[in-house]
């Protein structure tokens, strides 16, 4: 069995949630919440996680409008993805992240408000990554096959 390592990102204006998957590519879990500083520092922090986890791909949540269109925030996320692509050597994919933060908040309902604020972004990143992993499994596309395609998908 080949080991799979993919990172999921929930990119916000103040924080970036980071998630990773288990070596089988079945289960995503939160890793860290990066407090945004400046673009260079943000990209360095993500690059650190890519190197540390030996990530083969990065999945970024793309916040579509409820009608499926891309709004200003989605365009900012795509721009961030383009900047990230310039400094890393792994493919980037995008996943519709509508309501991932709402789902994350519900999942953390029993956690104290202070702790929830610290965890919500990484939980949202885990939801984004889990969605990506599940889509590949449902399409009967092994995660490794998806990684081998090495593309940047901005149409999803």
UniProtKB/Swiss-Prot annotation:
InterPro entries in the cross-refs: RNaseH-like_sf (IPR012337), YqgF (IPR005227), YqgF/RNaseH-like_dom (IPR006641), YqgF/RNaseH-like_dom_sf (IPR037027)
Swiss-Prot/TrEMBL GO biological process terms: rRNA 5'-end processing
EC code(s) of this entry: 3.1.-.-
Main location group: cytoplasm
Domain of life: Bacteria
A GO molecular-function annotation: nuclease activity
GO cellular component: cytoplasm
Major enzyme class: hydrolase
Keyword line: Cytoplasm, Hydrolase, Nuclease, Ribosome biogenesis
Localization (cell): Cytoplasm
Pfam families named in the record: RuvX
Residues that span the membrane, as ranges: none
Function, in words: Could be a nuclease involved in processing of the 5'-end of pre-16S rRNA.
Family assignment from sequence similarity: Belongs to the YqgF nuclease family.
Protein name as annotated: Putative pre-16S rRNA nuclease
Species, as recorded: Gloeobacter violaceus (strain ATCC 29082 / PCC 7421)
Organism classification: Bacteria, Bacillati, Cyanobacteriota, Cyanophyceae, Gloeobacterales
């Amino acid at each position: 069995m080949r080991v799979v390592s993919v990172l999921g990102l929930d990119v916000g204006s103040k924080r970036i949630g980071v998630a990773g998957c288990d070596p089988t590519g079945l289960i995503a879990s939160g890793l860290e919440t990066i407090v945004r500083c400046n673009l260079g520092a943000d990209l360095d922090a993500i690059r650190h996680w890519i190197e540390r986890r030996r990530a083969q791909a990065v999945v970024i949540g793309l916040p579509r409008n409820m009608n499926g269109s891309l709004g200003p925030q989605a365009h900012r996320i795509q721009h961030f993805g383009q900047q990230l692509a310039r400094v890393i050597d792994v493919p980037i994919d995008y996943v519709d992240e509508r309501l991932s933060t709402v789902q994350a908040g519900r999942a953390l309902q029993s956690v104290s408000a202070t702790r929830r604020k610290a965890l919500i972004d990484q939980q949202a990143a885990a939801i984004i990554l889990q969605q990506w992993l599940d889509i590949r499994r449902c399409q009967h596309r092994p995660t490794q096959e998806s990684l081998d395609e090495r593309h940047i998908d901005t149409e999803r």
